[in-house]
Every structure is written in structure tokens, then in C-alpha cells.
């Protein structure tokens, strides 16, 4: 099967993809601390892996290509730990606008922004109306683990959903980039299990992770992670994305 990855195709291949009215998946992620046991590139590794696997499942039924991953996002709340890059709001929107403009100029009309970092969600939701109006593209934005939230829950032991450097992300990294996981640091890789209870309040507030939420950089419990679980989690995430790509009503 030919590659679904933009970076592995020729310009001629990509002109053919545009002529076939392919959906462009644009992975957006982050480069930020992920506790003592995981590399800072977790969100980028996992988002790209899910996008690739989902596209490979869908490409038999719908033309699709995975654009290069935008590896920097909104990560101010992790800066105190070190190892983190972050955009401010105007820069993030400007970069996304430039990416979408390039995609449109090559003849593509449908773009699926697939996010892999919780800190990007609010910004993407806020940007979407303007980016859609300005670009004229059929444009969706999602977060890959939200697409499969109900299916992920069956594999989790203590957590209710995906958190940070947690059971889910650590298990998936044991599959996607196993050599980057420091297994000897797993005994200390845990924090509050189900996120900040203050999020239940009907008001918004900004809280940096280090001084307010976790001393380890972890929310959840990475001690529950294993590669077998990671395979299952990766599979359901890919299937959730593939289902969205193949949804004819979405892309009509």
C-alpha cells in the first residue's frame, strides 16, 4: 500500500491526492514535559501514530493523506518543569492559518485537524469559526482520544479517561516508541487520578501544573501501563479516527 504520509510522498503524488479530493489530516500536538518516565515528545509521537494508523484503515474507502505534524502548541502550563515549547494565542492561530493556506493552494478542500494535546482544545475550538470562514475549506477539528473516549474506558484500571503522562499515554508509548520509556522511573510516575476537582466549578481559571496540580508532572497513574494495553488503546483510537474519515455525512 502506498504511504499515507505527506512527508513520504512526491509532489506529483500529492497533486494526485488533491485531484482525488483527498481529506488532509493535520495532526497538531505539543512538545512538553511528561513526567520522569516519558519524553517531551509524547503528544507528537502519539498523535502522528494515531493519524497514520487511522488513515491506513480508512484509505481503502476514502482518499486521505496525513500532513506533517505541528509539534508545538499551547503548553504554558507546563513551562515550569522545563523541556517545553509553547505558542501564544496569536502565533498559534497564525501558524495554523499558514498551514491551511498552503494546503488549500495545492487544491485540497477538506481538512481534519486532529489534536493530541489537551491544552490545545480550547484554542482550536475558538479558532475554528474564523479559520473556516477565512479558508473556505470544509474544516473539522477533533482530539483523537475524545473520538474514542467510550471505547478507551474499558481498558483503564483506575482512571476514567485520558490524563497526562498516565496509564493511557505510557501504555501507548510502550508500543509507539518503547525505547523512550524509562521503566525504572515508573514507580514514581503517578499523581491525582482523575484531574483537578476544581474543573467542576462553572468558571474558568488558569492553573500551572507544577505548583497547583502535580509535583511529578503526571496526572493519573503510569504504574498501570503495559504494552498489551497500549496496543488495544492505539487500535481503538485509530478505529475511531477511521470511522470519522469514512463518515459520508461529515464530508458531504
Spell out what each predicted region is.
Residues 1-110, 118-252:
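Extended, histidine- and acidic-residue-enriched regions that form the cofactor-binding/catalytic faces
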Residues 113:
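Conserved SAM-binding loop
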Amino acid at each position: 500500500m502506498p504511504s499515507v504520509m505527506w512527508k513520504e510522498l512526491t509532489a506529483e503524488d500529492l497533486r494526485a491526492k488533491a485531484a482525488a479530493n483527498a481529506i488532509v489530516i493535520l495532526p497538531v500536538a505539543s512538545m512538553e514535559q511528561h513526567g520522569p518516565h516519558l519524553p517531551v515528545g509524547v503528544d507528537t509521537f502519539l498523535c502522528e501514530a494515531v493519524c497514520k494508523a487511522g488513515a491506513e484503515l480508512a484509505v481503502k474507502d476514502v482518499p486521505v493523506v496525513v500532513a506533517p505534524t505541528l509539534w508545538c502548541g499551547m503548553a504554558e502550563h507546563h513551562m515550569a518543569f522545563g523541556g517545553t515549547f509553547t505558542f501564544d494565542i496569536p502565533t498559534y492561530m497564525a501558524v495554523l492559518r499558514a498551514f491551511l493556506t498552503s494546503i488549500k493552494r495545492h487544491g485540497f478542500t477538506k481538512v481534519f485537524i486532529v489534536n493530541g494535546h489537551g491544552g490545545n482544545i480550547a484554542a482550536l475550538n475558538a479558532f475554528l469559526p474564523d479559520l473556516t470562514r477565512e479558508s473556505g475549506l470544509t474544516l473539522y477539528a477533533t482530539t483523537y482520544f475524545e473520538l474514542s473516549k467510550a471505547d478507551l474506558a474499558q481498558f483503564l484500571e483506575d482512571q476514567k479517561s485520558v490524563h497526562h503522562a498516565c496509564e493511557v499515554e505510557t501504555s501507548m508509548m510502550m508500543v509507539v516508541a518503547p525505547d523512550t520509556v524509562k521503566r525504572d522511573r515508573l514507580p514514581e510516575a503517578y499523581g491525582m487520578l482523575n484531574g483537578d476537582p476544581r474543573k467542576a466549578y462553572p468558571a474558568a481559571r488558569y492553573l500551572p501544573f507544577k505548583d497547583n496540580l502535580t509535583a511529578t508532572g503526571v496526572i493519573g497513574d503510569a504504574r498501570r501501563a503495559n504494552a498489551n494495553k497500549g496496543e488495544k488503546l492505539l487500535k481503538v483510537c485509530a478505529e475511531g479516527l477511521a470511522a470519522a474519515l469514512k463518515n459520508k455525512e461529515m464530508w458531504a
